[in-house]
Amino acid sequence: MGIISLNKASRLYWLGRYTERVYTGLKKVKPIYDAGVDGQEGDYAAYCRCLGIPGHYTDTVDFCKRYFFDRNDPNSLASSLAYAYDNAVVLRDTLTTDTLSYIQLAANAMEKAAQGDSPAVALQWVLDDILAFRGACEETIFEEETRSMIKLG
């Protein structure tokens, strides 16, 4: 059993927390997004209440656009992915460059989704890249404590 510094433990925890937030957020908001694509109103207000985030959106389309892609909103998935990337860069020596690259790929896919009119495919790439990141953590991080801190997040 090794010793992990408080700073490193914090970064590992938040890396796991932010990647989980993006993954779970995309999965849970999919029915709301689908409703918006179909021209219906999804129950985004209930989702916001459950997470304790401000429900200051005008409609389902506005919610999806801003919740997914507004990097100026600390509650958005794009912000969470940026925070995950920031932590991953600092932890490059622990994670390995190959593992870090999956977070970069997810960030690139999120950016591509934000720029397109039909973001569903690129958002699926974000999910795929986060799952690949998790798998890479299992395969390349040999210290159980380090892997556990990421999973704890």
Q: What role is predicted for each listed range?
A:
Residues 1-153:
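Alpha-helical transmembrane segments and their helix-helix packing motifs
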